[in-house]
Amino acid sequence: MSVWQQGATIELRIDSLSHTGEGVGRWQDRVVFVADTVPGDRLRVRLTHVKRQYAHGKVLEVVQPSGQRVRPNCIVADKCGGCQWQRVAYATQLAAKEQLVKDAIARIGHLEPQAFLPILAAPNPFGYRNKVTYPLGRRHGAVVAGYYQKGSHHLVNLNQCPVQDPRLNPLLAALKQALQPWPIYREQTHEPGFRHLGLRIGQRTGEQLITLVLAGPLPAGLAAEAEGWLQRFQGVIGVCVNFNHHVGNRIFGDETQVLAGRPYLWEEMAGVRFQIASTTFFQVNTAQAEQLVTTLRDWIAPTGQERLVDLYCGVGTLSLPLAGAVAEVIGVEVHSASVQQAIANAQHNGINNAHFVCAKAEEWLPRYDQAVDVLILDPPRKGCDRAVLDAILHNCPPRLLYVSCHPATLARDLAHLCSTGTYQLAKIQPLDMFPQTAHVETIALLTTS
């Protein structure tokens, strides 16, 4: 039997980590990706998917563990697909993320920044998530909530999670019991019921918001049940239901209704008090969001005279903490509910120089004819629409700060922005927003040449 085929067993050493979180090793000049491994591990591996020059494998035996291998904090780390790197020492995670950003900028963007700064570590590598959304199911009659097993749609049942704020752990366990009499959605038959449980916490305020995602009509008596939860669970200030009748992987639908209490919680970040609803985008790591804002402020070095435009502004997460240092802020966001919350947040904090527009960035920016001193981009993972990048090159603000959660799309967009010679890549700053996972946040500063 040829060794390079599915089912064959090989021995190799893991040298690095990939952007998907897998360990990367080499065997006879071919690349092998192996999940749940650590750089420095020597392994015996069974090949599971084989191509000509690369393969994926499964660990059969850790022949010699790496010195960078640690015991996972999670008892289901070998099954749960939520985290990829709980076996990897935190310093090694940071080095790997830094390298992932460097590789993307060089190989995809073909760029070399004037300064590549060391990654900003998270002060708390565990217990940092202020928001979690768990798929729901029923197994042997009992409600289960958790994340999907790696590479499957089998739910790994959780009563706690080491990366979420620890104050959410008892709430998760209690709500699974409280949901026992209520209908649970069946993915195979699309039988109506609750399909996701969303928990959110203001890490600085302690306020907690429960969101049930429902496929089907609102069950009778649910509002009364929700009122009881407000009394029963300390810190819970609201219970909402989101209606999602779509078949597929979409978590939230378009309609959210408050069942009890408030439809939002308050959070404090970078000196600003934010109103955050169940489906609103807000950085999941409050402490690292503050580091992000601090870095942006330092790089802008405001004089108080600037006009700052924030594209993909959400609820004003970046705009509002920066507003006090500049003359004017304009935030642009396509989701109307987020725009309304951004306006409410500005009013609540007495910020009068921030204005928010509900529009697509690619449609608004080409029409905007005023001079922009500083432009902030914080797009979704897919990056910016080409029309946005072309409008930036036409408007040509002297300072452009791009915040990205995906190094590959960041590198692609930076390459386009620098392709005409208008901009140069001045700085790159990786930031660890998502410890224990392969995801990395990056800030890029472009200045006019």
UniProtKB/Swiss-Prot annotation:
Which InterPro entries does the UniProt record give?
MeTrfase_TrmA_AS, MeTrfase_TrmA_CS, NA-bd_OB-fold, SAM-dependent_MTases_sf, TRAM_dom, U5_MeTrfase_fam
For this protein, the record's Pfam families field holds: TRAM, tRNA_U5-meth_tr
Q: State the top-level EC class.
A: transferase
The answer to whether keyword Metal-binding applies is: yes
List of residues binding S-adenosyl-L-methionine: 283, 312, 333, 378
UniProt keyword annotations, A-Z:
4Fe-4S, Iron, Iron-sulfur, Metal-binding, Methyltransferase, S-adenosyl-L-methionine, Transferase
User: What is a single molecular function from GO for this protein?
Assistant: 4 iron, 4 sulfur cluster binding
Q: What is this protein called?
A: Uncharacterized RNA methyltransferase tlr0942
* Alphabetical list of SUPFAM superfamilies matching this protein: Nucleic acid-binding proteins, S-adenosyl-L-methionine-dependent methyltransferases
According to its UniProt entry, the protein's GO biological process terms are: rRNA base methylation
Which residues does the Swiss-Prot or TrEMBL record annotate as the active site?
Answer: 405
Residues where [4Fe-4S] cluster binds: 74, 80, 83, 161
| Keyword Metal-binding included in the entry's annotation | yes
Family as reported in the entry's similarity comment: Belongs to the class I-like SAM-binding methyltransferase superfamily. RNA M5U methyltransferase family.
Q: Which organism is it from?
A: Thermosynechococcus vestitus (strain NIES-2133 / IAM M-273 / BP-1)
PANTHER family found in the cross-reference section: RNA M5U METHYLTRANSFERASE (PTHR11061), TRNA (URACIL(54)-C(5))-METHYLTRANSFERASE (PTHR11061:SF30)
**Which PROSITE patterns does the record cross-reference, listed alphabetically?**
SAM_MT_RNA_M5U (PS51687), TRAM (PS50926), TRMA_1 (PS01230), TRMA_2 (PS01231)
The beginning of the lineage is: Bacteria, Bacillati, Cyanobacteriota, Cyanophyceae, Acaryochloridales
EC number(s) per UniProt? Answer: 2.1.1.-
According to the entry, every stretch annotated as the TRAM domain falls at 3-61
Q: What are the coiled-coil residue ranges?
A: none
